[in-house]
Amino acid sequence: MKAGFLCLVLCAAVAPSAHAQMTWTDKAFVNITGGAQAGSHTVATSATFDLYDEQGTLSSSQKVGSGGLFDLSGGYKVRKNLAAGIGYSWSGSKADASITALVPHPIFTDQPRNVSGSVADLKHTENTIHLFAAWMVPVTDKIDVGISAGPSIFIVSQDLPTALTVTEPGPTVNQITTDKSSKTTVGINIGFDVAYMLNKRWGVGGLARYTWGSVDLKNASDKLTVGGFQIGAGLRLRLQ
């Protein structure tokens, strides 16, 4: 991931100077992209629940991994090769969580028992608004490159285990309750987009972009890193 981010930075630094003499002649662009977001982060939580008139504790750990990506973005020419743009992206994945809990005793007070288990298919989604400035570089009459950077607004939703019920004697885990934790945070984006035009209006292209942010989820022991390295391909529209 670090290598991909470094590549984006180098491309952003080199490409504008290498083609500074070429002016982008279109007025606006629209990009529609499908792909994947890479990355793997761990979210650990600790929550309390009531059972048998006492308080138990529930700890969980799960991986937030790679997922699918949809991106829709557009920009308008401000001056020469510079465009201002806005985009929306969605990324989502599912993962299992392992849990451990201290469960109160049904008869004796202050005699908690250890139980463990797992819960499947906890959803993680990121709806993100990207604001960016893009430097558009015509390479040939059919190929252009866009190098962009700016802030991103992440709207993050994560399923988290919050409580459980047990079967006695044992105890044996009967059901694990989950809750959706939603947070909004601001991060960054830096991207590199290549378009090959089939005619004056329509073409195909590829996107490589790095996004980053972090959120404090309910009951989480540490901040969760969101975003990551994104790659995809799709349709490219140019407006004259």
Where are these regions (language model features)?
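Cleavable N-terminal export/targeting peptides
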Residues: 1-26, 240
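Hydrophobic, lipid-facing positions within transmembrane beta-strands of outer-membrane proteins
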Residues: 28-30, 68-72, 127-131, 153, ...
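Extracellular/periplasm-exposed beta-strand and loop segments of Gram-negative cell-envelope proteins
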Residues: 39-65, 89-128, 154-185, 213-230
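Short glycine/proline- and aromatic-enriched beta-strand/turn motifs that initiate or cap beta-hairpins
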Residues: 20-78, 84, 230, 236-240
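Short, structured loop/turn "capping" segments at alpha-beta junctions
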Residues: 140-146, 160
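Outer-membrane beta-barrel transmembrane strands
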Residues: 62-87, 121-138, 183
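Transmembrane beta-barrel strands of outer-membrane/channel proteins
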Residues: 32-38, 86-90, 147-155, 194, ...
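Repeated loop/turn-to-beta-strand initiation elements of outer-membrane beta-barrel proteins
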Residues: 81-84, 143, 196, 200-204
